[in-house]
């Protein structure tokens, strides 16, 4: 199968050019002008459009069981939504397994979830929910099998203490893996939450008040220091929501510490006022939405390079689930927002089209740096000969209003309802195959491939 994309502006993280792009047998074969491929081939006219590498979303939660509920997107509906939003690769954060389970247990479970459902290519982050000799011995074997990043939690049921974190950091570093972490101070949150519940203060706004930014920032600072103690172990902070935590990361980077950070569209574009709306329960996620001042600080990090990745933390629970389970109490509400379909369009509209970032920086945030950090470069995140033919075509001339009824996930609402975006995803190709075109999903379940990722190699800081 040959596909020739003509007349578009091809953009990579290191530059852009108006040129044509030839994909053959799922692989980029040639870029340039006046390409004359052998017949037969499909021709796609991208006049006036940007031709970007397909998005790489390194933070999703599909089919996750959080005890009180299972998310309503499985690996078909979740990756279908991703494809329709220009994302061609996801790395899913696996949920917790049974108490005392081995690392391999959850990998086998999740490979079963995805095998016949995923529309796009996928991998997983391991999850370390307890520490013992068997777990530590498993890590290098898992890395050899293509799982080169693992997540630690400082909050929730399987939070690790500082000694366990140090053991994990050391072994992951020795094994060629990147440590990712959900950083929030669990004890401080539990104390604040108990105060509010005792006082009968259970409305959605108290979710945010029970998890102040200092809880997140303290945990970030602690992880930075523990990583240094563990031999300068590489560290990746997920879903950053505030400027104080970013300040700590800037300081670590200035001291040449190997730390990287992601944020998400919700922390750039939504704020804590959402909790005071009639549907405030739909915005329950952790860390919570912050104020506009924190948004501005994050946008500075997006613009000046301090933030490395924009992912989604897509974790969808329906409003029916939220209301039935919570009964109006924030502390009982399952956490998470949908967004895997909207990430690329929202960042393009609010970043590129406003002049906050260049098209090249857009690529760096949404595909190139995620691919580099998580062992997929140059197969993913790049349009060059030999790379996978993963492409998203965006037309900057089109304006669209986000409406849930036009989205492809399995949620019954969108936090982005009514947002107007300048720029539209008009086509998505995965390994040269069109899986979304002009509003219509054309992919199929099970075509996605499991990606064995390379051991961690730090990009140049």
UniProtKB/Swiss-Prot annotation:
InterPro entries in the record: Amidohydro-rel, D_phenylhydantoinase, Hydantoinase/dihydroPyrase, Metal-dep_hydrolase_composite, Metal_Hydrolase, Metallo-dep_Hydrolases_sf
Cofactor annotation remark: Binds 2 divalent metal cations per subunit.
Binding site for substrate: 156, 286, 335
Keyword Metal-binding among UniProt keywords: yes
Enzyme class at the top of the EC tree: hydrolase
Modifications made to the protein after synthesis: Carboxylation allows a single lysine to coordinate two divalent metal cations.
Entry keywords, A to Z: Hydrolase, Metal-binding
Function, as annotated: Catalyzes the stereospecific hydrolysis of the cyclic amide bond of D-hydantoin derivatives with an aromatic side chains at the 5'-position. Has no activity on dihydropyrimidines. The physiological function is unknown.
Protein name: D-phenylhydantoinase
